[in-house]
Swiss-Prot record:
One of its GO terms (molecular function) is GTP binding. This is Elongation factor 2. NCBIfam families: aEF-2, small_GTP. Catalyzes the GTP-dependent ribosomal translocation step during translation elongation. During this step, the ribosome changes from the pre-translocational (PRE) to the post-translocational (POST) state as the newly formed A-site-bound peptidyl-tRNA and P-site-bound deacylated tRNA move to the P and E sites, respectively. Catalyzes the coordinated movement of the two tRNA molecules, the mRNA and conformational changes in the ribosome. GTP binds at residues 28-35, 94-98, 148-151. Belongs to the TRAFAC class translation factor GTPase superfamily. Classic translation factor GTPase family. EF-G/EF-2 subfamily. HAMAP family: EF_G_EF_2_A (MF_00054_A). GO terms for cellular component: cytosol; ribonucleoprotein complex.
Length: 743
């Protein structure tokens, strides 16, 4: 009906109609067909030529993605879809399926309100289906389901229709189990998917068709006609042409998106209170709840893309309220600076078009601004130009910590500045990657979620940014903790004029998991608690602390807590900040081998301070407190934890024996084995130390037919017989004394 208008005009017109916008993502286990689906949706919505879809893989930006056949870097695309006589703007953020890139998924879900969960008909629900759906639900993203690759049921497996229906029903039940488990309480029922109400569609992204109950009812087209085409068509090309005429994928899937996924106006009402902890009655709170284009502008950056040739940075951001205009000055709340937005764009298909302004509810591309980080909150200044006094959006949390580190250096030392610049850029795109300079050795250390993650980073440095590098073997990151409790232990300052008394205890497991969850959700702050408030006290009390203890909590750092339990000590206020610094230093570098600590409760119970401030400076206080914490930890019984990955290995059943042997040889344990006709799913637990190179070994042990996925990551104590060896290795590497009890 509006075809005379150009696509760009249609996109621009829709940007001002938040009820007609859908910000969505496609989430799925690796290789379940997201990219193929995205291409076909784009093609259907007239953004790509139909011929290319499925082959061109337009969302594959990076060469190595093609090489590895995985989508690593999510891209943003937009399309226009007509539904019941009206236009809708669909902004789609592609998300990677491989869990080593889980950080990408987490960031992408922040920008979207709804998700199409893609499940492979044959594979069924796989580990990443669960991980990504969990992440989406945690951020209040509503799901609908698309069951893909149904063509295989018809052609390859030749299943009769009743078997196909049974299998579809099984997948729906499985997805609903996950929704029951992970959806927020108030949406557990409302968000269940159902074939009857049209929140489930199924089809073939490869052949470009889909069906849903509403579509079947509206058109009278059913599974019979589709099966008929498969049975009579000469080749895949003919199948595509004929199914396109009766049940084009984009129409069925995008109808489902428009009909069942929320507009920004609807979604922001319940998402803003969860993702932003400011005052909902302030002008910012009100404007965001309503996605009000006339309120103050607030936007959140969910991704930064760096062009490898021009090195220009483009930030993808979601506008939550107000109107972002080209050339406007804004505050970056985390970076704490004011910048001018040089260029603002939106997507038309995969192309960026420059625009003058974007209203609340839209996804935009900002270029020409340095220092924009993923997670940054952008706010319009107060009328007098000052920084608005509102909290930033909650930091974007990642479920897995980096556990593998490599030292990296340029082949040619003159490339060092270039390497540092490149690492900064890559880290901007991928904040799950950690880059540090080792204080002692001066080495550059990069840490990631596994050796595959780091391999991809190395590939980008060499091929995209053309810096030749040398890297060390991967090093595993351990954690230090204690078995029991100890103290008060005395720590004396070097001048012997100040004394601090410290107790240390292991955090009970239940408390640890609850604390971790609260940190992930952003309900408790990380770092020094600058201003204690009722909200923090309430959350601490729900962890089991008394009101008084809660009020005395000073720092929550790396999943450890510090409390000041002293009473009436004169001058304590002048040194407490240094005491907190000392606590954080030990949590960064524990006494066993300078690895980070977890799960500790550290309390300052008493102190004797010299009355003259000259004698109680940082040089006196910090070493005294550090020593007291380390000695107390030693008395409480030191424990070294190693990261352990729970993995799922997918192999033909003939290889169960080989894989079991492989896992046993790597200090692993088999947790579960499920066999189906032509595959076995082996769930196992393997220390990360033994996972290095696992992919290649698995491949050769299974003639290339085995793959594995990361399901979970936990820490477990290193076995007694390995403790000395591992501690020695780490200390040697770090140049620490080998024979000392503690370092
Ligand atoms: N038979 C069949 N194969 C499909 C279908 N959809 C996708 N595929 C194939 O499945 C493989 C993975 O498809 P992709 O679209 O790359 O999957 P993806 O989920 O984007 O994969 P990653 O980006 O690697 O996570 C490719 O070989 C596709 O050709 C389908 O409907 N039927």
């Amino acid at each position: 009906m509006v075809s005379e208008k150009t696509m760009a005009e249609r996109v621009l017109a829709l940007m001002g109609r938040p009820n007609n916008i859908r910000n969505i993502g496609i989430i799925a286990h690796i290789h379940h067909g997201k990219t193929t689906l995205t291409d076909n949706l784009l093609a259907g919505a007239g953004m790509l030529s139909e011929e290319l879809a499925g082959d061109a893989m337009f969302t594959w930006w990076h060469e190595q993605e093609r090489e590895r056949e995985m989508t690593i870097y999510g891209a943003a695309v937009s399309m226009v879809h007509e539904y019941e006589g009206d236009d809708y703007l669909i902004n789609l953020i592609d998300t990677p399926g491989h869990v080593e890139f889980g950080g990408e998924v987490t960031r992408a879900v922040r920008a979207i309100d709804g998700a199409v969960v893609v499940v492979d008909f044959v594979d069924g629900i796989m580990p990443q289906t669960e991980t990504v759906l969990k992440q989406a639900l945690r951020e209040y993203v509503k799901p609908v389901l698309f069951i893909n690759k149904v063509d295989r049921a018809i052609k390859e497996l030749q299943l009769p229709p009743n078997k196909i229906m049974e299998r579809l029903a099984e997948i729906v039940v499985g997805v609903n189990d996950l929704i029951e488990r992970y959806a927020p309480e108030e949406f557990k029922d409302k968000w269940k998917v159902s074939v009857q109400n049209g929140t489930v569609a199924f089809g073939s992204a490869l052949h470009n068709w889909a069906l849903s109950v509403p579509y079947m009812q509206k058109t009278g087209i059913g599974f019979k006609q589709i099966a008929e085409i498969y049975n009579t068509a000469a080749d895949a090309k003919e199948i595509r042409r004929r199914v396109w005429e009766i049940a084009p994928l984009y129409r069925v899937v995008l109808d489902m998106v428009v009909r069942h996924l929320p507009s920004p106006k609807e979604a922001q009402k319940y998402r803003v209170p969860k993702l932003w902890h400011g005052d909902l009655n302030s002008k910012y709170g009100k404007a965001m709840l309503e996605a009000d284009p006339n309120g103050p502008a607030v936007a959140v950056v969910t991704k930064v893309i760096v062009d490898k040739t021009s090195k220009q940075e483009t930030a993808i951001a979601r506008v939550w309220s107000g109107t972002i205009r080209r050339g406007m000055e804004v505050w970056l709340l985390n970076a704490n600076k004011k910048v001018r937005l040089q260029q603002v764009g939106v997507f038309k298909g995969i192309q960026k078009i420059q625009i003058e302004e974007a209203k609340a509810g839209n996804i935009i591309a900002i270029s020409g601004v340095r220092d924009l980080q993923s997670g940054e909150t952008i706010v319009e200044p107060e009328p007098d130009g000052s920084k608005p006094n509102i909290p930033p959006f909650e930091a974007i949390k990642h479920i897995f910590d980096p556990v593998v580190t490599k030292a990296i250096e340029p082949k040619d030392p003159r490339d060092l500045p270039k390497l540092i610049e490149v690492l900064k850029l890559i880290q901007k795109e991928d904040p799950t990657l950690k880059v540090e300079i080792d204080q002692e050795s001066g080495q550059i250390l990069i840490s990631g979620l596994g050796d595959l993650h780091l391999e991809i980073v190395e590939y980008r440095i060499k091929n995209d940014f053309k810096v030749d590098i040398i890297t060390s073997n991967p090093i595993v990151v351990y954690r230090e903790s204690v078995k029991g409790q100890a103290g008060p232990v005395e720590g004396k300052s070097p001048n012997k004029l100040n004394k601090f008394y410290i107790t240390v205890e292991k955090m009970p497991d239940e408390l640890y998991w609850k604390l971790r969850e609260k940190l992930l959700k952003g309900e408790l702050p990380e770092g020094k608690i600058k201003k204690m408030n009722e909200d923090i006290i309430k959350h601490l009390m729900s962890l089991g602390f008394t009101r008084e203890e809660a009020q005395r909590c000073k720092v929550i750092y790396r999943e450890n807590m510090f409390f000041d339990m002293t009473r009436g000590i004169i001058h304590i206020g002048e040194v407490i900040d240094m005491v907190m610094d000392a606590f954080m230093q030990v949590m960064d570098h524990g006494p066993i081998a300078w690895e980070p600590c977890i799960g500790l409760i550290v309390k300052l119970t008493d102190a004797q301070l010299h009355e003259d401030a000259i004698h109680r400076g940082p040089g006196q206080v910090i070493p005294a407190v550090r020593e007291a914490i380390k000695l107390a930890m030693k008395d409480a019984g030191l424990v070294l934890y190693e990261p352990v990955q729970v993995i799922l290995v997918d192999v033909p059943p003939d290889y169960i024996g080989d894989v079991t042997a492989l896992i046993n040889s790597r200090r692993g344990a088999i947790l579960d084995i499920q066999t189906e006709e032509d595959r076995a799913l082996i769930k196992a637990k393997v220390p990360v130390r033994e996972m290095i190179g696992f992919t290649d070994t698995l491949r050769s042990a299974t003639s290339g037919r085995g793959v594995w996925y990361l399901v979970d990551q936990v820490y477990e104590p290193v076995p007694r017989e390995l403790f000395d060896q591992i501690v020695r290795e780490i200390r040697q590497r770090k140049g620490l004394p080998l024979d000392a009890d503690i370092v």
